[in-house]
């Protein structure tokens, strides 16, 4: 995440950046710094955690054999009949596991359309959080996936993973107000669509 490990939640667009927890997070911070130094009109969309796929199961993320994101990890665990590793359960969160703001990729795509249309009408530099505003833990995601797809996951808890932000979720009031955009898909939609895409890839 561009915010690092924030002190106050939810994060707004005015929340100061903390130290990036990974090279990926650092690139996000540097890209925004470059845009701020340029004369280019721009919209920076600060994604939170995109998940899901198109409900048709025809468009999705073809992850590597060793995915690093939670939902692809879950799906690969099921398809390969292997045990999944939860990276730490001793964080200061509601159940000890990391907390994220998960957003369906279809909602995310719609936010891009809204942002481009807004930039046509209102030039300048704009920044928006793109999330749902809800913090969900790793263990909660596992339970949601199991319930939505009637699947029992095999997992164990291991040590923390370097570079993981403990907890972050968005205040989306700015994008709701200015772009008239808000997430519509539920987490259950995300779980069903993710598993549908994974099954379709194996055919």
Set out the residue ranges of the language-model regions.
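Catalytic helix-loop patch of NAD(P)-dependent Rossmann-fold dehydrogenases
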Residues: 2-49, 58-69
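A short alpha-helix capping/helix-coil boundary motif
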Residues: 12-15, 51-55, 122, 150-153
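C-terminal substrate-binding subdomain of Rossmann-fold SDR/epimerase-dehydratase oxidoreductases
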Residues: 76-203
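Short alpha-helix within the catalytic core of nucleotide-sugar-dependent glycosyltransferases
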Residues: 36, 71, 109, 113
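C-terminal catalytic core of Y-nucleophile DNA break-rejoin enzymes
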Residues: 68-71, 104
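Short aromatic-enriched loop/helix-cap "lid" or pocket-rim segments at secondary-structure transitions
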Residues: 7-9, 54-59, 98-99, 141-142
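Short amphipathic alpha-helices and their capping/turn segments at secondary-structure boundaries
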Residues: 38-39, 72-80
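Feature marks short, surface-exposed loop/turn motifs that line or immediately flank catalytic pockets
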Residues: 3, 51-54, 134-136
